[in-house]
């Protein structure tokens, strides 16, 4: 299990958001990919849970570039919802595109999912959930911001 793991964070269940102290996620790791589908990447993040016998098992794995892209996606979404209240439906049905983020010679399009038949209700619930999670999100954004600022110094 520890083969090719370089960085580890044990005890994740203590800080897992609203699941803190009740989470099934026990450990986060960074190292060489373990899943065949990720072998082309050099580094991946792994999420570990206990199986029914209490042994740690790999629950999820993502290459680090996908984690960064999820952070870009989430960050842009958070920025979008800061001003979405100005739109009656929280989005413009005629212009669902939020931003096209340039990456790797192409783009990561970020848009409201107008294919969702219940988007008008779901986007309101999503916005309310972001508001309800404000304290959890805010704390993590502050920590992430501090670390990103430190990275800029290198």
PLM feature spans:
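A short, structured beta-strand/loop element
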Residues: 25-60, 82, 89-103
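Short, solvent-exposed segments of well-ordered alpha helices
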Residues: 53, 57-65, 106, 110-113
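Elongated alpha-helical scaffolds
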Residues: 67-76
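Charged/polar low-complexity intrinsically disordered segments, enriched in acidic residues
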Residues: 96-150
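C-terminal non-catalytic accessory extensions
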Residues: 153-154
């Amino acid at each position: 299990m520890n083969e090719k793991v370089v960085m580890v964070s044990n005890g994740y269940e203590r800080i897992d958001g609203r699941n803190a102290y009740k989470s099934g996620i026990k450990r986060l790791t960074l190292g060489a990919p373990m899943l065949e589908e990720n072998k082309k990447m050099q580094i991946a993040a792994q999420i570990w849970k206990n199986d029914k016998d209490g042994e740690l098992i790999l629950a999820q794995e993502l290459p680090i570039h996908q984690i960064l892209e999820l952070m870009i996606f989430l960050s842009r979404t958070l920025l979008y919802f800061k001003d979405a209240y100005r739109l009656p439906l929280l989005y413009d049905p005629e212009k669902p595109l939020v931003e096209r983020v340039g990456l790797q010679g192409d783009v990561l399009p970020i848009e409201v999912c107008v294919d969702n038949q219940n988007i008008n209700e779901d986007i309101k619930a999503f916005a309310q959930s972001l508001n309800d999670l404000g304290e959890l999100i805010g704390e993590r954004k502050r920590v992430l911001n501090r670390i990103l600022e430190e990275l800029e110094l290198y």
